[in-house]
Amino acid sequence: MSGKEESSNYAATAEEEAVNQGFVLPEGEIMPNTVFVGGIDITMDEIEIRDFFTRFGNVKEVKIITDRTGVSKGYGFISFSDEVDVQKIVKSQISFHGKKLKLGPAIRKICTYVQPRPVVLSHPTPFHHAWNNQNADSYIQHSPIVSPITQYVQACPYPSSPPMAIQQIPVGCQQPGYFQVSPQWPADQRSYMFPTPAFTFNYHCCDMDPNGGEPIPREYPIDQTVSASGANPQKRYVEMSTQTIVSCLFDPANKFHSFVSQEDYLKDNRVHHLRRRESVIKRVSK
């Protein structure tokens, strides 16, 4: 009898024994020389179980299944290094610490793989955007040229999920989109803005000597701006009530500077000119 026939007969016998004990074996491959032990108390440890099952053969490994917190789930597996009769161990009624153990063949579950289904990738709809304005430029945005992209296969298949089409933006792009700029405006609607230049003009005036001497020429710089249209300089008017031009006259008698307002200065200037005119008329009449 070949090894395959022996394993098949052993699996059939183990399944019959499991059905007789009232539980159904899961689908999978029966592990040789390994026994499933259920009904393990929390107080039991692996050393005690190893010492107890040495009567059936040389115990290779004892594995108690625990949860994430390390608490025993109440079952485990015992592997023997020698050839043992697993059916004999399963049929025997074993009680440990006054508690009956549930024995059965150890079965390795078969990992079922679902054939991966390719995910359908749809290319995005070409996007055209045109914005026109009479007084502005026209921008036309074309869709970017996309290179062929390899279809991605879903790594984690879900058997119960229906086929789905995922629309996403492709990653592999050869070159970005192009923009065409075409200026559209009439010639008479163009307007140009230039910075306003600043010019400084020197304003010449004469300060009168209080002793009746010759007038003293002086220069006062005045800033003027030129309009953007290129016309004449814009005059800057100063209200006499809000701002007065102070003229500093040197007094040789008292050796200090006296300050007079614009109104007093103009009044004294008119009186001085009238006096000079009268003196000139008198000299001519003589």
Swiss-Prot record:
Limits of the RRM domain: 33-114
Listed under GO cellular component are:
cytoplasm; mitochondrial cloud; pole plasm
> Could you state one GO biological process linked to this protein?
3'-UTR-mediated mRNA stabilization
For this chain, one GO molecular function annotation is: RNA binding
The UniProt entry, under PROSITE patterns, shows:
DAZ (PS51890), RRM (PS50102)
- Disulfide links within the chain: none
Which cell locations does it reside in? Cytoplasm
Which InterPro entries would you find in this protein's record? Answer: DAZ_dom, DAZ_RRM_vert, Nucleotide-bd_a/b_plait_sf, RBD_domain_sf, RRM_dom
Q: Which UniProt keywords apply?
A: Cytoplasm, Developmental protein, Differentiation, Oogenesis, RNA-binding, Spermatogenesis, Translation regulation
Tissue specificity of this protein: Germ-line specific. Oocyte mRNA expression is first restricted to the granulo-fibrillar material (GFM) of the mitochondrial cloud and then to the oocyte germ plasm at the vegetal cortex. Remains an mRNA component of the germ plasm until the neurula stage. In 2-8 cell embryos, expressed in the germ plasm matrix between germinal granules and mitochondria. Expressed in primordial germ cells (PGCs) later in embryogenesis. In addition to the ovaries of adult females, expressed in the testis of adult and juvenile males in spermatogonia and spermatocytes.
Highest taxon, organism lineage: Eukaryota
Q: Where is the DAZ domain?
A: 155-180
Give the record's subunit note. Answer: Interacts with the C-terminus of pabp1 and with epabp. Prior to oocyte maturation, found in a complex with epabp and pum2 proteins and spdy1 mRNA; pum2 dissociates from the complex during maturation.
UniProt lists the family membership as follows: Belongs to the RRM DAZ family.
Its function, per the record, reads: RNA-binding protein that is required for primordial germ cell (PGC) differentiation and indirectly necessary for the migration of PGCs through the endoderm. May promote meiotic cell division during spermatogenesis. Shows a preference for G- and U-rich RNAs and probably binds the 3'-UTR of target mRNAs. Stimulates the initiation of translation of mRNAs through the recruitment of poly(A)-binding proteins (PABPs).
Listed name of the protein: Deleted in azoospermia-like-A
List the source organism: Xenopus laevis (African clawed frog)
Query: Per UniProt, what is the name of the gene that codes for the protein in this document?
Result: dazl-a
